[in-house]
């Protein structure tokens, strides 16, 4: 398997026997009046006025590290100008278009599948997993989900992220632990909601993310709670940045110059735990307000299932609406039980977006 970088995820196909997956539900101070000394006869009497109350000095909130989830929480998002650029395919049940939108000073590209019919249709913004930007093409990743969901009445908008396909480049995206990808998907939703395209239902929007895109989705959920109506993640990376670094860091990679810069600037997780925790979604999962469906295979050796188990446990402890489905024997990309998983996904979105 190809080495994957800081937070990357490669696809690994494992054929597995189908089985019924496991689903988990989801002291008081006293003040005395001042005494006044007796006034001699004939002397004028003056009534003491109230003493001035000192104005408290405002407490300054420490500015978060720019590479942190808190910085994303504080950020203002300006996704807009969703434009359909050209038709690339007509599959009968739906048409596929190249699109762009603006946000964070960048133009981001993507593809959008639009079902035939009058609409308006609910919208799903898809967040793809790690693919080398040098070989990535528009809309790459999750082709089965693209097709199935469009055929079942959903507009599917796949964001390419910055630095991918025709999107504007951001040379610091890797150095910033790919947290800017969450900015791109948040701005994709903002662009949908501000669009005048008549077939988009701005009041019914969800997120779906796979692998690295699962982590992008979790980060977006905590950065902008309430922006979408529901979310689904498949085979997600960990909600702790340190886990992902330890799993995917490969010093011998061509991209290791960035990795060395990260280690030199921020420190390794064991030496700088505060930085790595601040760059993680998990400490902020109590901010999630949307129903969440989590799919994970028990034989995933790219993103171990224990990562989703820990994420789900944290969400449940916070009282969140999360459903966890484990697929016995499935690997990272899903094989025999993919159909079952996408049917659950569609039913989940049908429930929460309709």
Regions flagged by a language model, labelled:
Residues 288, 294-296, 300:
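Short beta-strand/loop motif that positions the catalytic acidic residue
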Residues 73-118:
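N-terminal cap/lid segment of alpha/beta-hydrolase-fold proteins
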Residues 175-196:
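Alpha/beta-hydrolase active-site loop
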Residues 306-354:
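C-terminal catalytic histidine-bearing segment of alpha/beta-hydrolase fold enzymes
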Residues 119-121, 126-168, 240-241:
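Short substrate-entry loop that stabilizes the transition state in hydrolases
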Residues 218-269:
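Hydrolase active-site cap/lid region
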């Amino acid at each position: 398997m190809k080495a994957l970088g800081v937070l990357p995820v490669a696809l690994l196909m494992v054929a597995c026997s189908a089985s019924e997956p496991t689903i988990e539900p989801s002291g008081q101070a006293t003040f005395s009046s001042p005494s006044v000394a007796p006034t001699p006869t004939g002397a004028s009497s003056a009534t003491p006025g109230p003493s001035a109350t000192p104005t408290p000095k405002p407490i300054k909130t420490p500015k978060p590290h720019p590479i942190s989830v808190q910085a994303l929480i504080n950020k203002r998002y300006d996704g807009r100008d969703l434009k359909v650029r050209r038709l690339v395919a007509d599959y009968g049940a739906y048409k596929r278009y190249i699109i762009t939108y603006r946000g964070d000073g960048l133009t981001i590209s993507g593809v959008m599948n639009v079902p035939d019919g009058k609409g308006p249709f609910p919208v799903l913004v898809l967040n793809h997993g790690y693919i080398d930007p040098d070989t990535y093409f528009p809309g790459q990743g999750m082709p089965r989900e693209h097709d199935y969901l469009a055929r079942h009445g959903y507009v599917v908008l796949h964001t390419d992220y910055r630095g991918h396909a025709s999107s504007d480049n951001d040379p610091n995206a890797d150095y910033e632990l790919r947290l800017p990808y969450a900015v791109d998907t948040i701005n994709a939703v903002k662009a949908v909601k501000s669009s005048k395209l008549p077939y988009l239902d701005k009041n019914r929007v969800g997120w779906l993310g796979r692998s690295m895109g699962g982590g992008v989705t979790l980060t977006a959920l905590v950065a902008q709670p309430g922006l979408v109506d529901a979310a689904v993640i498949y085979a997600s990376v960990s909600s702790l940045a340190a886990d992902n670094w330890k799993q995917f860091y490969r010093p011998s990679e061509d991209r290791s110059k960035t990795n060395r810069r990260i280690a030199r600037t921020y420190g390794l997780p064991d030496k700088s735990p505060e930085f790595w925790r601040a760059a993680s979604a998990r400490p902020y999962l109590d901010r999630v307000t949307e129903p969440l469906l989590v799919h994970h295979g028990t034989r995933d050796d790219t993103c171990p299932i224990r990562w989703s188990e820990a994420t789900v446990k944290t969400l449940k402890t916070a009282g969140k609406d999360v459903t966890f489905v484990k697929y016995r024997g499935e690997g990272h990309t899903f094989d025999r039980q993919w159909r079952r998983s996408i049917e659950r996904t569609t039913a989940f979105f049908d429930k929460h977006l309709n």
